[in-house]
């Protein structure tokens, strides 16, 4: 068997190693100047006013919800077709996740579904920019504004994603992820952008013990007077070791996403006559970042189940992923919310499969995946 082809692999090279050496030699390896540079770079990338680097997008979601005052008795609208950390954070704050269905073909929430789920207890809406495509954020934001409800964009998949000519996160509040499989990575990390000055200040405090300044600020400006806790907070700051990696990855993002697009376009062309159906791309003006390439494997049409297909591809040395198993079908949420029924989410959650997609894939790697799928489809 050929070498195993994973569904994702981070693209790291000499520039990342040099950036790490620079930080290690500097004597300041935790939150410091590289964080500040990363935050400034994301303000430039998105056009938003504030950027706050954090240790993960999950931590970013936690402190953003908390900074908005989300707590017991509140409801937060979210798709079930998302990574479970969002729902976990809502529940850990004592609020209730209100899971809504997604469009059957692009797997993102719609303004109509959001509108139908709003109650007097709704305090936030969390649309997900999915697989590298943008949600119809103008329409969703309009619903939030009409009801006075905050919108938090889950942009974990959206580094390099554009909506109507602007980078996702150019206004409002959005949360990006730098996890190992993302379009740009620093192993673990995340970043929040916002145009709300007060919210940015609260998030900065909450992500570092509830203090008004971080360790680098105190080192730079002196320790007198001693920083005080403004409100109890967490330790979600990003180390400069990670921020240095993220800065190099950001420089490579455009080129990396171009390669992702080339691979995705080959999949679209060369699998078009197979029964493996990809997600549809949004009808609104956008630039896709192709974080994931997802097919739907319907046993009735394909002659094989999704799980069986993944096993056969694994036996052929090809890795795949599942993004995501719907949250409401998992034990805790299934038992807590037994009444939730989301037909589009459930149909897709049982059939979606993420194919290998990362910038360092060779043309031969792509051919190998396509050939395997054509073989398994009988084409």
From Swiss-Prot:
Record key words, sorted:
Aminotransferase, Antibiotic resistance, Lipid A biosynthesis, Lipid biosynthesis, Lipid metabolism, Lipopolysaccharide biosynthesis, Pyridoxal phosphate, Transferase
Which Pfam family is one of those matched by this entry?
Answer: DegT_DnrJ_EryC1
> What Enzyme Commission number(s) does the record list for this chain?
2.6.1.87
Q: Which InterPro entries match?
A: ArnB_NH2Trfase, DegT/StrS_aminotransferase, PyrdxlP-dep_Trfase, PyrdxlP-dep_Trfase_major, PyrdxlP-dep_Trfase_small
Look up the signal peptide feature and give its range.
none
Q: Which cofactor does it need?
A: pyridoxal 5'-phosphate
- UniProt cross-references to HAMAP family, sorted A to Z: ArnB_transfer
Protein name as annotated: UDP-4-amino-4-deoxy-L-arabinose--oxoglutarate aminotransferase
Organism expressing this protein natively: Klebsiella pneumoniae subsp. pneumoniae (strain ATCC 700721 / MGH 78578)
């Amino acid at each position: 068997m050929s070498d195993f082809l994973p569904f994702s692999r981070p693209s790291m090279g000499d520039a990342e190693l040099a950036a790490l050496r620079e930080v290690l030699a500097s004597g300041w390896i935790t939150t410091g100047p590289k964080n500040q540079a990363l935050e400034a770079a994301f303000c430039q990338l998105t056009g938003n006013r504030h950027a706050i680097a954090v240790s993960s997008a999950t931590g970013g979601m936690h402190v953003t919800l908390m900074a908005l005052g989300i707590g017991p008795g509140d409801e937060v609208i979210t798709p079930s077709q998302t990574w479970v950390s969002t729902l976990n954070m809502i529940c850990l704050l004592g609020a209730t996740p209100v899971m809504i269905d997604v469009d059957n073909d692009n797997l993102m929430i719609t303004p109509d579904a959001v509108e139908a789920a709003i109650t007097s207890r709704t305090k936030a809406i969390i649309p997900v920019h999915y697989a590298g495509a943008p949600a119809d954020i103008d329409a969703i934001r309009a619903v939030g504004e009409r009801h006075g409800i905050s919108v938090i964009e889950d942009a974990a998949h959206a580094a390099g994603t554009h909506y109507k000519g602007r980078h996702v996160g150019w206004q409002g509040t959005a949360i990006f992820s730098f996890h190992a499989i993302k379009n740009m990575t620093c192993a673990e990390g995340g970043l929040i952008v916002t145009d709300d000055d007060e919210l940015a200040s609260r998030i900065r405090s909450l992500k570092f013990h509830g203090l008004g300044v971080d360790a680098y600020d105190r080192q730079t400006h002196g320790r007198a007077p001693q920083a005080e806790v403004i409100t109890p907070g967490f330790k979600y700051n990003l180390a400069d070791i990670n921020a240095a990696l993220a800065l190099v990855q950001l420089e490579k993002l455009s080129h990396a996403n171009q390669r992702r697009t080339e691979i995705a376009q080959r999949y679209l062309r060369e699998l078009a006559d197979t029964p493996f159906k990809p997600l549809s791309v949004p009808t609104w003006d956008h630039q896709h970042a192709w974080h994931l390439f997802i097919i739907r494997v319907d046993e009735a049409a394909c002659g094989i189940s999704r799980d069986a297909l993944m096993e056969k591809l694994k036996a052929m040395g090809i890795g795949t992923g599942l993004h995501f198993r719907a949250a409401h079908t998992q034990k805790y949420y299934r038992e807590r919310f037994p009444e939730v029924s989301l037909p589009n989410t459930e149909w897709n959650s049982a059939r979606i499969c993420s194919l290998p997609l990362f910038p360092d894939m060779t043309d031969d790697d792509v051919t190998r995946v396509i050939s395997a799928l054509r073989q398994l489809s009988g084409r």
